[in-house]
Amino acid sequence: MTNIRKTHPLMKIINNSFIDLPAPSNISAWWNFGSLLVICLILQILTGLFLAMHYTSDTITAFSSVTHICRDVNYGWIIRYLHANGASMFFICLYMHVGRGLYYGSYTFTETWNIGIILLFTVMATAFMGYVLPWGQMSFWGATVITNLLSAIPYIGTDLVQWIWGGFSVDKATLTRFFAFHFILPFVVLALAAVHLLFLHETGSNNPTGIVSDSDKIPLHPYYTIKDILGALLLILVLMLLVLFSPDLLGDPDNYIPANPLSTPPHIKPEWYFLFAYAILRSIPNKLGGVLALVLSILILAITPLLHTSKQRGMMFRPISQCLFWLLVADLLTLTWIGGQPVEHPYIIIGQLASVLYFMILLVLIPIASIIENNILKW
């Protein structure tokens, strides 16, 4: 008799996706981040669900309800900090996942890559709206500043901002709708992740060499499931160290001050995982130009398949491109640092140079380096 997992309509889908899936025999730990992202998403949905049971999306009680969760609800503090730091872990895994895709040329799977970009935007939107919910100073002013950017859109900008706010400023209507969207979007992310996986399984996984590995596949289970469990344990270890020892390390102290529309914090800044994009936004003096640069800093990923000039897929055997890739990583870390600094000399010029370099590396330097490498190898 054939095994039920290979015949049952539902079990068959699970089997073909997570058990008997043919995987390349040489994929490294950089291929662990997909499963880690699923773990992060499930953790965020579960902790978020329990937080939503006690949270009230009203400007008067929102801040107190978060305090109530931490002080009075059984294990509320750990649920709250797991959710807040879980978001940080989510973005660390996301950026490493995208970085892996750029390094090893996984963007040549265009459908999978484009769904991934949509996923990135959706997760960023979800995280932004979640940051508004505790209704601290940084929540309120972050929401005001970031939503206000839409007013840079010609003709409809101002009306659009007021439509999103549900009034003439960030207020109760804004908080309520942000809570509604913050609750529903993770399920949209879950659905998109399933589509992402569907497209990936049409082509099969890439591998570090970038060479077609159809002749040398191994089943996902037990080889890569056990490897994923190791990654998951490390993820949980780092998360628990953060939550139990320094839960506010990555947060902003200003968010422990209740939102006050009459008092502006000295430095308005988003969560650390948006600082690189925020630095790019601030480096352009023009409002519309800044907003365009902000959107393009992520959307630029969509044109990477068109900019691929190398005869090889990944960067494993391309030393010049490797140097540029790590320069890009260093540049992004610089932008993250600049995004958290006040707008004054020398931070302004450093931010502008780092922003120009970011676009230069992706649009100009890597494609040119790839052509040089092709010529060196006489391809």
From Swiss-Prot:
Protein's cellular compartments: Mitochondrion inner membrane
Binding, a ubiquinone: 201
InterPro entries recorded: Cyt_b/b6_C, Cyt_b/b6_C_sf, Cyt_b/b6_N, Cytb/b6-like_sf, Cytochrome_b, Cytochrome_b_C_euk/bac, Cytochrome_b_N_euk/bac, Di-haem_cyt_TM
Entry keyword Calcium: no
Chief location: mitochondrion
Cellular component, GO annotation: mitochondrial inner membrane; respiratory chain complex III
Protein residues bound to heme b b566: 97, 196
A molecular function GO annotation: metal ion binding
Function per UniProt: Component of the ubiquinol-cytochrome c reductase complex (complex III or cytochrome b-c1 complex) that is part of the mitochondrial respiratory chain. The b-c1 complex mediates electron transfer from ubiquinol to cytochrome c. Contributes to the generation of a proton gradient across the mitochondrial membrane that is then used for ATP synthesis.
Subunit field text: The cytochrome bc1 complex contains 11 subunits: 3 respiratory subunits (MT-CYB, CYC1 and UQCRFS1), 2 core proteins (UQCRC1 and UQCRC2) and 6 low-molecular weight proteins (UQCRH/QCR6, UQCRB/QCR7, UQCRQ/QCR8, UQCR10/QCR9, UQCR11/QCR10 and a cleavage product of UQCRFS1). This cytochrome bc1 complex then forms a dimer.
Similarity remark: Belongs to the cytochrome b family.
Protein name: Cytochrome b
Native species: Pagophilus groenlandicus (Harp seal)
